[in-house]
Amino acid sequence: MARYFRRRKFCRFTAEGVKQIDYKDIIMLKNYITESGKIVPSRITGTCSKYQRQLAQAIKVARYLSLLPYTDEHVRRESCTTEVP
């Protein structure tokens, strides 16, 4: 049986020597947000804790300034209750 080989995750920001994550870099921030608008955890992306905190703060600031949406789905959901005749 062959073993599954998983690539080692690494922090992209440490490798590139980034000092501070900029909230205005929307293209980069979109890579760390799911389709539903949630912030992707560091165990998935491989980002170290220092930059994960900066990343979360930058995403929250960008959302507050309307540079990023809070959610991609702006569909109004039907209520769970049914009407009684």
From Swiss-Prot:
Pfam families: Ribosomal_S18 (PF01084). PROSITE patterns: RIBOSOMAL_S18 (PS00057). GO terms for molecular function: small ribosomal subunit rRNA binding; structural constituent of ribosome. It comes from the Bacteria. The keyword RNA-binding applies. One of its GO terms (biological process) is translation. NCBIfam families: S18. This is Small ribosomal subunit protein bS18.
